[in-house]
C-alpha cells in the first residue's frame, strides 16, 4: 500500500525513501530529499533545496525549506539540512540559508521543535535542543546541544545560545547566553547555572561545583569581563572534573561577537 496520500503532491525530482509517509494535501518540492521512515503531516510544505534525514516527524501545516525572509535574497540555491529523529510540530517554519552567510540552515539530531516555532535563515541548531511553542529565532542564530528555549521567546539575529543553557519563556534575548547558564526576562539576564539540566545529563557533582564557581566569577564578583576571563582561565586548569566544561565556557566567552548577557 502506498505511503503517500493520493491528494499529496510530490514534484518531479524529489527523492523520497520508500518508507516515507506523506499525509493529505502535503507538497514536496523537486529539490527535496527525505530519508527513511520520516513522516510528513497533512498540508505541510517541504520545499527548496532541503535534505531531511531519517525517522523525523513533521507535523501538520509545517513550512520547511521556504525562502529566507531576507530582502537581499535573489533566488540563490541555498539549502536546509535536517538530521535524524527530530520532531517538528504543526505550523513551524524553517527557512533555507543565504549566500551572505554559509548558505545553509542546519538542524541536528533528536531535537524537539514545538508548534509555531520559527527558525530563520542561516540558523545552526545543534542536537537534543528543545524549542518551546512560539519561540522565534531570527537569522544566523546558533543554538548549542541540549539547550532549551522557552515559549514565546524572541532571539535577535546572530545571537548564540550555549550548550546546556536555558532561556525562560517570554524572554527577549539580544546577546549570547554562555553554556550552562539560565537566562530570562526582557531583556534576558542571567539567573544561575542550569544545575538540574546538568544532573540529568550526567555531569558530576564536582563538575557542577566548578561551573557554579565559574558563574560566580563571571557574574557575582564585581569583576570586569577581562578580569573574569583571567580567573576563568585559571579555574579551567584546576585539574578537576569540571575543567573541560569550564574551558568550553571560557572559549565561548572569548569568541562572542555580540557580547554575553551580563
From Swiss-Prot:
Its main location: cytoplasm. CDD domains: LbH_UDP-GlcNAc_AT. Its EC number is 2.3.1.129. It is found in: Cytoplasm. It catalyses: a (3R)-hydroxyacyl-[ACP] + UDP-N-acetyl-alpha-D-glucosamine = a UDP-3-O-[(3R)-3-hydroxyacyl]-N-acetyl-alpha-D-glucosamine + holo-[ACP]. One of its GO terms (biological process) is lipid A biosynthetic process. The keyword Zinc does not apply. Pathway: Glycolipid biosynthesis; lipid IV(A) biosynthesis; lipid IV(A) from (3R)-3-hydroxytetradecanoyl-[acyl-carrier-protein] and UDP-N-acetyl-alpha-D-glucosamine: step 1/6. PROSITE patterns: HEXAPEP_TRANSFERASES. GO terms for molecular function: acyl-[acyl-carrier-protein]-UDP-N-acetylglucosamine O-acyltransferase activity. It comes from the Bacteria. GO terms for cellular component: cytoplasm; membrane. The keyword DNA-binding does not apply. Homotrimer. Involved in the biosynthesis of lipid A, a phosphorylated glycolipid that anchors the lipopolysaccharide to the outer membrane of the cell. Belongs to the transferase hexapeptide repeat family. LpxA subfamily. This is Acyl-[acyl-carrier-protein]--UDP-N-acetylglucosamine O-acyltransferase. It comes from Burkholderia mallei (strain ATCC 23344). The gene is lpxA.
